[in-house]
Design a protein with these regions (language model features):
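N-terminal charged helix/coil linker that caps or initiates catalytic domains
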Residues: 1-26
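Conserved N-terminal Rossmann-fold NAD(P)-binding element of oxidoreductases
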Residues: 27-29, 52
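Hydrophobic/small residue at the entry helix of a nucleotide-binding pocket
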Residues: 33-34
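Conserved S-adenosyl-L-methionine
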Residues: 42-48, 136
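Glycine-rich phosphate-binding loop and adjoining beta1-alpha1-beta2 segment
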Residues: 46, 51-89
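Conserved acidic residues
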Residues: 98-100
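Short amphipathic alpha-helix with an adjacent loop that forms part of the alpha/beta core around
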Residues: 104-114
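E1/E1-like adenylate-forming module used to activate ubiquitin-like modifiers
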Residues: 116-117, 121-202
């Protein structure tokens, strides 16, 4: 009998789909990057999520965030994302953490229970803490670099942090990884130069 994951099973096989169903992924930051990550994972059949974000949907998020609509403005991002996941897969297990992840509260999270960690937060200190905690727990992690004011999707690449260029955030992360003796880190970054920022919306 066909279900919402039949095409995924046809593409990757039943064994792979079973692994996805058992997978537990933590996504830190449910915004322009993290929201699309969670959506794709849910549609792929990942069965268990931890969602971490303290923000609410703002009207200015509508141009780029998958959870943002006029109906969701003002609602907690993690709650909106939970509803979207369940509308795709009612059997998904979801734990919400309506908080900002900081080095000060990292001990509240048990990274060892995750199969994969996605860092989609903006704060450098938080990004570093997420990566270090995942590495310490032996859990695979991918970190998103700067995407603000960039419009060319063809310029995005998946690479090791030490092979990145142009991106200022990646430069800061490279320095931090060297300082903490982290030899490799998978990241998504763009070689595109950012567009000029608009100082004020009118």
């Amino acid at each position: 009998m066909l279900n919402q994951f039949s095409r995924t099973e046809l593409l990757f096989g039943s064994e792979a789909l079973a692994k996805l169903k058992k997978a537990h992924v933590a996504v830190f930051g449910i915004g322009g990057v993290g929201g699309h990550v969670v959506e794709a994972l849910a549609r792929s059949g990942v069965g268990s999520f931890d969602l971490i974000d303290n923000d609410t949907v703002a009207i200015t998020n509508i141009n780029r965030q998958i959870i943002a609509t006029l109906d969701t403005v003002g609602q907690p991002k993690v709650e909106v994302m939970r509803k979207r996941i369940l509308s795709i897969n009612p059997e998904a297990e979801i734990t919400l953490h309506q908080c900002f992840f900081l080095p000060e509260n990292k001990d509240e999270f048990d990274f060892s229970k995750y199969d994969y960690v996605v860092d989609a937060v903006d704060t450098v200190a938080a990004k570093i803490a997420i990566v270090l905690a995942a590495k310490e727990a032996g859990v695979p992690v991918i970190s998103s670099m700067g995407a603000g004011n960039k419009v060319n999707p063809a310029m995005f690449e998946v690479a090791d942090i030490y092979k990145t260029s142009i991106d200022p955030l990646a430069r800061v992360m490279r320095q931090a990884m060297k300082k903490h003796h982290i030899k490799k880190l998978k990241v998504v970054y763009s070689k595109e130069l950012p567009l000029l920022q608009v100082d004020e919306l009118k």
